[in-house]
Amino acid sequence: MKVIAAFLLAKLGGNENPTSNDLKKILESVGAEIDETKIDLLFSLIKDHDVTELIAAGREKMSALSSGGPAVAMVAGGGGGGAASAAEPVAESKKKVEEVKDESSDDAGMMGLFD
């Protein structure tokens, strides 16, 4: 993620064709760890592609994701517990879903992108 951010910063700064040395300078300026393999991988994946096209394709893929939240598995009540024991797992799963929704609102839809 840091390598992509450095690449985009170089592009935003007016460098139309950033090099790996440009990315290293940006990463060094903020004290970030430099991973040569990730830099090389980025350049191999984006060669012959326009950044705006890549962003548009990513945006399209993100919009295709379900925004309904995480799937909750319903637990069926075991043997002789009756309706009371079956209702307990449902109540617990609803509580867990609410907790997950509260945590995800902090990310503002970024799904932990910068963790």
From Swiss-Prot:
Gene3D superfamilies: 1.10.10.1410
CDD domains to which the protein is assigned, alphabetical: Ribosomal_P2
Annotated Gene Ontology cellular component terms: cytosolic large ribosomal subunit; cytosolic ribosome
InterPro entries registered for this protein in UniProt: P1/P2_N_sf (IPR038716), Ribosomal_P1/P2 (IPR027534), Ribosomal_P2 (IPR044076)
Region (Disordered): 78-115
Record flagged with keyword Phosphoprotein: yes
Modification type Phosphoserine: residues: 104-105
UniProt-listed GO biological process terms: cytoplasmic translational elongation
Keyword Magnesium found: no
Keywords: Phosphoprotein, Ribonucleoprotein, Ribosomal protein
Sequence ranges of Basic and acidic residues compositional bias: 91-103
Any one GO molecular-function label of the UniProt entry: structural constituent of ribosome
Subunit structure: P1 and P2 exist as dimers at the large ribosomal subunit.
Record function comment: Plays an important role in the elongation step of protein synthesis.
Family: Belongs to the eukaryotic ribosomal protein P1/P2 family.
Protein's recorded name: Large ribosomal subunit protein P2x
Organism in which the protein naturally occurs: Arabidopsis thaliana
Taxonomy of the source species: Eukaryota, Viridiplantae, Streptophyta, Embryophyta, Tracheophyta
Gene it is expressed from: RPP2C
